[in-house]
């Protein structure tokens, strides 16, 4: 193509010389830039087609990369600007009339190109003189062109903004407006919500798991895809690392702090299982390998309701119900106590059941894009919850702002502390026993009966020392219900209302005994003694008063004290040659500072002498052998005390002695401790496997007493210790069957109340243990009046 020949023409009369020079300059530029012009025209035509089809078209459809292109267009100013071409700037006579709307549309297409096509330029040049007479002056026309260009730019911006708003409305449905949207917690909410919205295919989690499993088997495969749960776990871990760095104290080598010394040999946390692999391993061990799966993906199935049979699968650890049409969640979801991950996102849920708060093992709860307006206070029980996804819900601003400012853990703590005393348990019923031991069913409440010459009552109660009642240990308890002032008032009221003849308490602080319990009990006709744990001997006077121990009280008008003896298990063992000093004895037994308090009392009405033992054994289930050895030593030493104060060496007299052993034994029914008490012997029990304690493991444990649990008639209580990590019966009152008979028992805690609770203490129960109470009758003809 010869540009010079095509565009040459004769000078036009009356045309200014400056315009002719400008034409020559333009022709020279066109001649030099022909190749670039054609390339630019092709690129611009493609951009116009994409723009008209993708953004400016009437049928806008959002795409996956729309946000990226939109950011480039709006924020980087890369979209096409409508600018006058060189000919329009310097040759106003080349323009057609701008008055008709159809011609304006054509001009808009032309204005987006830097140069006009050459053929059009020739045609306009040939009619230059005629159009010069019809067009207004150059300055006036250029002003009109600028106005037209500005109008078109505004229209483009309006269309782009409309498209951006449409895309934003699709990606940010019901977005919550919080006061601080730039906080790291809220950024995580939005990021994870976007990931969740992208997981809208049926069985999303199952597909992802299968895909990642295939990639894991192929060493050359691409990197595994990161799903919602993995992304959440990563974000939570990074936050915890940052918080840990801020809180990390300086680690000084040397003597432990006072708090560390007080908590020696005491469990200091109620954490369930912090590692996912440990939890899965525990589940497999619990089911003995019979349960091979623990996750269920029902996402994207269009479910409207959930069958109640689903909640019989109490082994489930992950349940995915996202992208369905659920309007509500059944309250029976509380049966899934092992759940760690629950996804209810993208449904139509209006309200969450309070029972969901009983799923205290939950760590990740996703509720994105529902119609939830508030969260129940029972969510304060979710002590393991690390993240709750609430973006896309019309949630109360106070809750949303709390999550945005302080995160999920602070939300749970706030809901927990805002819990009020809404529910009160029914009084514990009183169980009456006939002479043959049969329990009489009754709804009667325990009442203090008139004194009888041959009856007495015994209460055993672990009152929870205030130094152990920490927010870290009892994360599920409202902070106000954990305060000692609140708890001690409940404890005092409870103990005095039962008004038993003998009271055995465990975990009583030394200072609390001296300044609180002793004055209170003395004022109500009791006399009491106290013995603290061994560690108090190695501490200063101030710190030693914070150590806990056992306290025994008895009514002055019912009993008189013959003798009392403090009992340290490790000291007794080391001070006697009859206990073999083995490796296990030193490494496992000697560093436990548990104690017992033995009171030898005489019943004033009958003259019967009764040995009352109050003890608290070691807590750790990994040391069940130590507990069995402690009980073996206790019963062996008790024989010596009875022989001494009954002035007898007869085994028959020892068997017929009146004995009551109370305490927190930290042992369940199938333990070696229970076996030793109830049968009189324990040999070859699994608790002692692989241990060497001399004669206790070679010959087994033996004692001559005939002891029985007071609650054996009812098969023991469902529990005496209730926490999220452990719920079972570990407190007992043992009695000698030849001389004593059980006539009444304090029943269990209201089942309806405990079904809505994950652990004690709470607003109504001041300790993690519940008291046990038994009424005994001295058997006729078995009384021994000798002193």
Swiss-Prot record:
The keyword RNA-binding applies. The gene is CCR4. Its main location: cytoplasm. Residues 37-70, 92-137 are annotated as: Disordered. Belongs to the CCR4/nocturin family. This is CCR4-Not complex 3'-5'-exoribonuclease subunit Ccr4. Its EC number is 3.1.13.4. Residues 37-54 have a biased composition (Low complexity). GO terms for cellular component: CCR4-NOT core complex; Cdc73/Paf1 complex; P-body. It comes from Candida albicans (strain SC5314 / ATCC MYA-2876). LRR repeats lie at residues 291-313, 315-336, 338-359, 361-382, 384-406. Keywords: Cytoplasm, Exonuclease, Hydrolase, Leucine-rich repeat, Magnesium, Metal-binding, Nuclease, Nucleus, Repeat, RNA-binding, Transcription, Transcription regulation. SUPFAM superfamilies: DNase I-like (SSF56219), L domain-like (SSF52058). InterPro entries: CCR4/nocturin_mRNA_transcr (IPR050410), Endo/exonu/phosph_ase_sf (IPR036691), Endo/exonuclease/phosphatase (IPR005135), Leu-rich_rpt (IPR001611), Leu-rich_rpt_typical-subtyp (IPR003591), LRR_dom_sf (IPR032675).
């Amino acid at each position: 193509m010869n540009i010079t020949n095509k565009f040459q023409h004769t000078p036009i009369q009356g045309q200014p010389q400056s315009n002719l020079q400008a034409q020559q300059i333009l022709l020279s530029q066109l001649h030099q830039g022909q190749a670039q012009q054609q390339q630019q025209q092709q690129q611009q035509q493609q951009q116009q087609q994409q723009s008209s089809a993708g953004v400016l078209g009437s049928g806008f459809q959002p795409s996956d990369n729309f946000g990226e292109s939109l950011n480039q267009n709006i924020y980087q100013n890369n979209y096409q600007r409508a600018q006058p071409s060189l000919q329009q700037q310097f040759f106003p006579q080349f323009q057609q009339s701008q008055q008709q709307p159809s011609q304006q549309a054509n001009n808009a297409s032309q204005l987006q190109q830097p140069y006009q096509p050459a053929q059009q330029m020739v045609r306009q040049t040939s009619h230059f003189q005629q159009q010069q007479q019809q067009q207004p002056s150059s300055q006036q026309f250029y002003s009109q062109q600028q106005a037209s260009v500005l109008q078109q730019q505004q229209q483009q911006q309006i269309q782009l903004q409309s498209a951006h708003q449409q895309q934003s409305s699709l990606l940010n449905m019901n977005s919550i407006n919080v006061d601080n949207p730039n906080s790291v917690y809220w950024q995580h909410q939005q990021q994870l919500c976007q990931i969740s919205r992208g997981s809208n295919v049926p069985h999303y989690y199952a597909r992802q798991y299968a895909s990642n499993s295939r990639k894991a088997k192929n060493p050359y495969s691409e990197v595994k895809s990161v799903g919602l749960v993995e992304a959440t776990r990563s974000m939570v871990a990074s936050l915890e690392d940052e918080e840990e760095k801020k809180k990390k104290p300086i680690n000084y080598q040397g003597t432990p702090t006072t708090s560390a010394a007080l908590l020696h040999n005491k469990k200091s946390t109620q954490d369930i299982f912090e590692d996912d692999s440990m939890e899965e391993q525990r589940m497999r061990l619990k089911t003995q390998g019979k349960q091979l799966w623990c996750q269920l993906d029902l996402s994207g199935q269009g479910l409207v309701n959930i069958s109640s049979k689903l909640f019989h699968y109490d082994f489930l650890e992950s349940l995915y119900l996202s992208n369905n049409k659920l309007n509500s969640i059944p309250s029976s979801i509380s049966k899934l106590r092992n759940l760690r991950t629950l996804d209810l996102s993208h449904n139509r849920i209006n309200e969450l059941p309070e029972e969901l708060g009983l799923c205290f093992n939950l760590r990740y709860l996703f509720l994105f894009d529902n119609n939830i307006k508030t969260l129940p206070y029972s969510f304060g029980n979710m002590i393991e919850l690390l993240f709750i996804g609430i973006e896309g819900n019309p949630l109360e601003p106070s809750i949303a702002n709390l999550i945005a400012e302080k995160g999920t853990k602070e939300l749970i703590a706030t809901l927990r502390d805002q819990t009020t005393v809404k529910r009160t348990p029914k009084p514990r019923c009183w169980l009456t026993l006939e002479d043959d031991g049969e329990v009489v069913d009754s709804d009667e409440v325990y009442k203090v009966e008139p004194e009888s010459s041959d009856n007495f009552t015994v209460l055993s109660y672990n009152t929870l020392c205030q130094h152990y009642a920490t927010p870290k240990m009892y994360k599920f308890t409202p902070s106000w219900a954990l305060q000692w002032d609140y708890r001690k008032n409940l404890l005092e009221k409870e103990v005095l209302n039962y008004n038993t003849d003998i009271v055995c308490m465990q975990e009583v602080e030394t200072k609390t005994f001296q300044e609180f319990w002793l004055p209170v009990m003395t004022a109500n006709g009791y006399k009491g003694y106290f013995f603290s744990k061994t560690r108090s001997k190695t501490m200063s006077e101030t710190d030693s008063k914070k150590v806990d121990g056992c306290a025994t009280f008895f009514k002055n008008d019912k009993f008189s004290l013959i003798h009392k003896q403090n009992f340290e298990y490790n000291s007794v063992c080391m001070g006697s040659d009859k206990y073999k000093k083995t490796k296990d004895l030193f490494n496992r037994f000697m560093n436990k500072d548990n104690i017992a308090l033995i009171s030898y009392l005489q019943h004033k009405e009958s003259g019967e002498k009764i040995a009352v033992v109050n003890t608290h054994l070691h807590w750790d289930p990994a040391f069940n052998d130590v507990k069995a050895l402690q009980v073996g030593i206790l019963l062996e030493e008790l024989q010596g005390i009875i022989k001494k104060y009954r002035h007898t060496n007869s085994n028959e007299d020892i068997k017929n002695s009146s004995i009551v052993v109370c305490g927190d034994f930290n042992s369940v029914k199938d333990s070696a401790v229970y076996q030793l008490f109830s049968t009189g012997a324990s040999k070859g029990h699994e608790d002692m496997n692989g241990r060497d304690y001399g004669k206790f493991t070679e010959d087994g444990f033996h004692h001559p007493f005939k002891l029985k649990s007071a609650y054996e008639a009812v098969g023991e209580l469902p529990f005496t210790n209730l926490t999220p990590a452990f719920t079972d019966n570990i407190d007992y009152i043992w009695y000698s069957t030849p001389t004593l008979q059980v006539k009444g028992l304090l029943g269990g805690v209201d089942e309806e109340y405990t079904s809505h609770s994950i652990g004690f203490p709470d607003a109504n129960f001041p300790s993690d243990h519940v008291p046990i109470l038994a009424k005994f009758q001295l058997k006729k003809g078995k009384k021994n009046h000798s002193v």
